[in-house]
Amino acid sequence: MAGQVVQYGRHRKRRNYARISEVLELPNLIEIQTKSYEWFLREGLIEMFRDISPIEDFTGNLSLEFVDYRLGEPKYDLEESKNRDATYAAPLRVKVRLIIKETGEVKEQEVFMGDFPLMTDTGTFVINGAERVIVSQLVRSPSVYFNEKIDKNGRENYDATIIPNRGAWLEYETDAKDVVYVRIDRTRKLPLTVLLRALGFSSDQEIVDLLGDNEYLRNTLEKDGTENTEQALLEIYERLRPGEPPTVENAKSLLYSRFFDPKRYDLASVGRYKTNKKLHLKHRLFNQKLAEPIVNTETGEIVVEEGTVLDRRKIDEIMDVLESNANSEVFELHGSVIDEPVEIQSIKVYVPNDDEGRTTTVIGNAFPDSEVKCITPADIIASMSYFFNLLSGIGYTDDIDHLGNRRLRSVGELLQNQFRIGLSRMERVVRERMSIQDTESITPQQLINIRPVIASIKEFFGSSQLSQFMYQSNPLSDLTHKRRLSALGPGGLTRERAQMEVRDVHYSHYGRMCPIETPEGPNIGLINSLSSYARVNEFGFIETPYRKVDLDTHAITDQIDYLTADEEDSYVVAQANSKLDENGRFMDDEVVCRFRGNNTVMAKEKMDYMDVSPKQVVSAATACIPFLENDDSNRALMGANMQRQAVPLMNPEAPFVGTGMEHVAARDSGAAITAKHRGRVEHVESNEILVRRLVEENGVEHEGELDRYPLAKFKRSNSGTCYNQRPIVAVGDVVEYNEILADGPSMELGEMALGRNVVVGFMTWDGYNYEDAVIMSERLVKDDVYTSIHIEEYESEARDTKLGPEEITRDIPNVSESALKNLDDRGIVYIGAEVKDGDILVGKVTPKGVTELTAEERLLHAIFGEKAREVRDTSLRVPHGAGGIVLDVKVFNREEGDDTLSPGVNQLVRVYIVQKRKIHVGDKMCGRHGNKGVISKIVPEEDMPYLPDGRPIDIMLNPLGVPSRMNIGQVLELHLGMAAKNLGIHVASPVFDGANDDDVWSTIEEAGMARDGKTVLYDGRTGEPFDNRISVGVMYMLKLAHMVDDKLHARSTGPYSLVTQQPLGGKAQFGGQRFGEMEVWALEAYGAAYTLQEILTYKSDDTVGRVKTYEAIVKGENISRPSVPESFRVLMKELQSLGLDVKVMDEQDNEIEMTDVDDDDVVERKVDLQQNDAPETQKEVTD
């Protein structure tokens, strides 16, 4: 028997065909959300208050500091927030200190700064009652970037950009004459040396001494018209502020505020880290030949002699000296923007491949402290040096699509940025109030206006592109939505501008971003998914784990290192399937490995790391596709995406052929209920589980407190499916931490169960499975195999109107008693009622404008005392195709103190209708390999082809769907599934390390099936065997959310467009079907003139004609001739609006009046129309 039996959770054993043992457990799959939010609450908020403190007034007398903060208790708990359409949030209270410097008085106060949304345990937010997910954003990291470009003459050129987190960009570029220019904040370019002079390097000689002599620098100095620091400052000021009178002081303060003011310019810690990494000497001297010795500046000792070529070992040896003070120089700058001395490290090296022995100076930024978030003069000088080095062939350009240069902004950082915007708006208000208020009586509360902070947070959660309504179709869709990475959004790319290169798979995605799972369509490659083992480090770079190879013994160690993409570039990484002996040494002398994106074979001694698992390349959803290695990537993409659209079934079933990921995905998705502590189950019922904690102290286990786990029963999910949890533990069970206690939707025994295992035959059947269509047995309908439950929510509000309040009532004008049979005495439908399209759910009347009563009516009202009820029926009715059973009714009243109702609403009624949808012709089905199709026919069970033992098969698929699509995985799944069913086992075939051909065929033989996996099938209609043996097996098929019930739509009459008077389009608007240009040609070709005429008039925009037609049909009379369509009159008006005098003339050249006809006129003149049906009359009466 191939494979070994592995336990997945408490209830499921699977035969696992993996050959590689798991060295590292999968991390918690939603920690990308939870960890980031925890960081925000722990550090992010404090960091922001620290950045903004203290706020001082313009005189410097008042100072406001933010000391500390605390979060209070949420007003409503999670369930209550969802029920009341409220936000699950806690009050944020900040301790604020006001210091009045004149008197030395200190006032401390706790200030309420709005309700702050809290993250649920499952990584979501509840905003206005709906669950939302904040998607992580993939953006360019702040750093220094060097780019290679070809100019219009075909010459190789370079440009460079210093990109901060916020602040002005600094760009360097060369022109055709080899002059180097700088652009400050996208303005006009200046010679580079102007900026250097402005920094305090006044003379040409100082600049040459600093950067080293080269022709680019000489050309730039010739172009430079300034001669000293003051002139350079004035030149820069004129470029940045044209039209203002330049002074040296103004120029200094402008340059300071652009680059050196922490409030205006921020590299962020990640920018400082990347800049140091790029510009420091230790990263730039690799493989360079020294033209001067490296000296320890403190001791004067020569560390490395001139002429030495620095390899990696040599650099490691002198690392301490390089990081401290090797060849350091300090410049005292006079008349500069910054008063402090500038420290740099500079070393001359020989230009590579140069016969003349020319040298160039490599200048490093002498490692500014990681706390320095601004750019420093040393950074600017070092970046200029790097640029000149590039022109000499030293250094390398950056690949912007490399994941070392792209980072993630997760929830915490996105929230922090948004909060910062609110705080900076608030800061302005505080400053203004400080100058107005009386200092004696002033308090922090009076100074602070929290509106801008609350507004910016609300705006972020409510309308940001990255705050998305959670796609809650099944546990997998929950999970992948939380692990999604988007390159779109504020500060990111836009769909239209994103080029092929950004969207493409990059070698640095390996183990970090899934190469398979991305949407089809305009967002392809811009929205990605995090790989299964990936994690995000403190700087926002994605790391992936590798097993460390011991450099001495060349054996794999137990140490696991997480590497970012640019760290990985320095190492050789072996594949996870490399063969190892019992000591962890590579068995083959040559090992398949990766180095900087090249897949190659190297000697085993050169290995530095090894992959932890074959599935570390792919995301959680892709890792759920068995035999992924046998599928074409395009189809695997569809398979991964379609699993997310599977509808939760009434009786779900875990797959016979899984990958072992089903249990993990179900546990981490948040749809299941998991134990928060180890304990013993004390009580189980359908809506609650009680677990007594077991606590160990001094080696003795004793009982602790009781944990209560409420279960969700038949709730509506965000996508209108049924969200229901079922216990899978029994009283007395001892459960471990994080063990599954209750299955959620689309789960069975603690495993994800998106579909059902059905017997499938690859065969044609009377052409019904043409074009990927699916033929299904009626058994799947009768036995509720693919039946799903759908819950829809409808609401009705009673508001205050100008004419009086609306009223929810059973007393509705002009409605028969039979139409009110399902309503209670309040006028609201009762729970359990079966309702059909058009039935009333909530009776509601709205006051109409009061009309003047006649004398007789006034008398009657005076006698009988009855108020004139001028009301209109505005009841909530069941929309078309949405009938079902009323599951629940919720009523919210303002009188009963429901403060969550929006202004002007007195009463809100919510009705939930549940539908049980069996599978239909027209529903979409799919497998896990991108093999999708629509059901074309449901065949009676007795007519389906049957196996030799008499069992009819469930589904027939077209065999032509396999070869051209190259998703052979489905065929292997089919055979292995049949074997597993016959053996009564479940199997796991992990991706890239699953069952191979031999395993499949040996399992088939073990199950007593034919070696080729095929069988004779008999035609259910005739009993005759089919000519050839047919592949029959068990495949896992899903029912997708694209159901025919949601798409089926018909209209007789309905709403019309205001201007053209043509019917609207689409099911949502209850619109008609467009009869377009080509359809008109078809009728013209047939000569069906009258059919065409009525389509273009009555059925479209002949406003008078359609009223008359309706009346004629009701009365059973002949339909009169059509009048002028509205669109013709619109065309006339449009031409008239252009100043063209357009008139309609008859044959005698008399003008035909195109009159405007009111609805009342139409009614009055209908009689005339029927009496006098002459063509002239028709032309006159138009609308």
Curated annotation (Swiss-Prot):
Report the EC code(s) recorded for this entry.
2.7.7.6
MF terms from GO for this chain are:
DNA binding; DNA-directed RNA polymerase activity; ribonucleoside binding
Q: Which UniProt keywords apply?
A: DNA-directed RNA polymerase, Nucleotidyltransferase, Transcription, Transferase
Q: List the record's Gene Ontology CC terms alphabetically.
A: DNA-directed RNA polymerase complex
* InterPro entries in the cross-refs: DNA-dir_RNA_pol_bsu_external_1 (IPR019462), DNA-dir_RNA_pol_su2 (IPR015712), DNA-dir_RNAP_su2_dom (IPR007120), DNA-dir_RNAP_su2_hyb_sf (IPR037033), RNA_pol_bsu_bac (IPR010243), RNA_pol_bsu_CS (IPR007121), RNA_pol_bsu_protrusion (IPR007644), RNA_pol_Rpb2_2 (IPR007642)
GO biological process terms held by the UniProt record: DNA-templated transcription
* Entry function: DNA-dependent RNA polymerase catalyzes the transcription of DNA into RNA using the four ribonucleoside triphosphates as substrates.
Q: Which family does it belong to?
A: Belongs to the RNA polymerase beta chain family.
Q: Which PANTHER family match?
A: DNA-DIRECTED RNA POLYMERASE I SUBUNIT 2
Q: How does it assemble?
A: The RNAP catalytic core consists of 2 alpha, 1 beta, 1 beta' and 1 omega subunit. When a sigma factor is associated with the core the holoenzyme is formed, which can initiate transcription.
Protein name stated in the entry: DNA-directed RNA polymerase subunit beta
Species in which this protein is naturally found: Staphylococcus aureus (strain JH9)
What taxonomic lineage is listed for the species of origin? Bacteria, Bacillati, Bacillota, Bacilli, Bacillales
Please state the gene responsible for encoding this protein: rpoB
